[in-house]
Amino acid sequence: ETWAAVRPTSSRKYLQDERIHFINLNLSSEEELEKELAPHEFDYIVHAAGATKCLHAEDFYKVNTEGTKHLVNVLLRLQMPIRRFVFVSSLSIFGAIREEQPYQEISEHDTPKPNTAYGKSKLEAERYLDSIGNNFPYIILRPTGVYGPREKDYFLMAQSIKQHVDFAVGFKRQDITFVYVQDVVQAVFLALDHGMNGRKYFLSDGEVYQSAAFSDLIKKELGNPWILRIKAPVWVLRIVTFFGEYLGRMTGKMSALNNDKYNILKQRNWRCDIEPAMDELGYHPHYPLERGVKLAIKWYKDNGWL
């Protein structure tokens, strides 16, 4: 059986398969979680729930760090007979490291230096899992930028290009990596099947791209509209994201251009080493950027997003 943890207010629009069962989980309360999970016994758990945008930095910790702690604590207290627990973390836990050219791949042996509240909250969740040690069968996945159907951040780029504007930041070379959502799913199932306890794996499509590669492919799939390509210095982005953050807090609506986004867009090196995932999990990405963008844009068109 497959169960999906949802909130009472969660949309189930894309969870229409009749084989899916639903369970309401409140990750903010261990007491509530214990009541909700006690009647069940799960063999495998994929913890992909998390916040990527918050008005206040502390909210990242409440959801991404504390929510993970609460879930794991309750599973241990209930002595749930879990075979494997896959935690979906992020490459963002490492922050801007190995930024000297020529850029080198970020590896599992590097010291994380997260520069976003999101990355810091994910790292704290990882460290909590590490602190439990062999008492809990966990595997951690660290995908780079994930794109595909229903993803909203990269969709904003496609929407902007359709409106004839492509915006980039910084004049220093930027090496970017991507991973299509289906390749992340592949890695999740491989980790569930034979992942080694306590191991951590980076995920990408195995290639490295320059900053314009993604927008060029979007442009191609949109029929090559004319575009105004704007490349602004980093200090302009700093001003825009500062006011975006301020207005977001004033209006209660988080801006896509905020303080975390500033650090993400400013970062120049997103290379990562996926060899351990390939060697140990048997992970082999099937969606290079051109194929993935084609599928993503088709979905956006078919579903009226573009």
Indicate residue ranges for each PLM-predicted region.
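Conserved C-terminal active-site "lid" loop/helix of NAD(P)H-dependent oxidoreductases
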Residues: 181, 216, 240-284
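Active-site Tyr-X1-5-Lys
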Residues: 113-141
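Substrate-positioning beta->alpha
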Residues: 124, 151-156, 169-192, 198-199
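Amphipathic terminal alpha-helices
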Residues: 272-280, 284-306
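Mid/C-terminal beta-alpha module of Rossmann-like enzyme folds, strongest
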Residues: 191-257, 290, 294-297, 304-305
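NAD(P)H-binding glycine-rich loop region in Rossmannoid oxidoreductase-like domains
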Residues: 21-66, 91-96
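Flexible, glycine-rich beta-alpha linker
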Residues: 94, 139-156
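Conserved Rossmann-fold NAD(P)-dependent oxidoreductase catalytic core, especially the SDR/UDP-sugar
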Residues: 69-117, 139
